[in-house]
Amino acid sequence: MATLSEDMKTFIENNLSWIATISKDGELDLGPKMSMFVLDNNHLAYHERTAGQHFKNLQDGSQLVVAVANLAEKKGYRFRGTVTLHTDDAIYEEQVRVAEEKGTKKPAAVPVMEINEIQDLTSGANAGKTIAKD
């Protein structure tokens, strides 16, 4: 597993994340995830509220790519990994409680990504280069 730095954790908390998955037919799906959060040093997670195409793709075994960027800072990160879908365990129940506290829709699932690779998206010579890889 690749490990998040404290800077990366703060960056994720303060910027919008975009995710990408791919269907069995090879169709790419891209969308924002405002509920993205750091679960621990090696995992990202979010509230899957719509149970739409991303959810289906993950159920079908798609890997997950998460990109987080800040235009003003010209800085960003890309995270790649495999996902476990949580629907009836302690992780899920804790996030249902969080959703209730925030007044947001109860998640259909909580996808948790084990981070296998971290790439730098900061503008410049290192853009797209791997920072850490499992």
Positions of predicted regions on the chain:
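Binding-site signature for planar aromatic cofactors or substrates
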Residues: 1-134
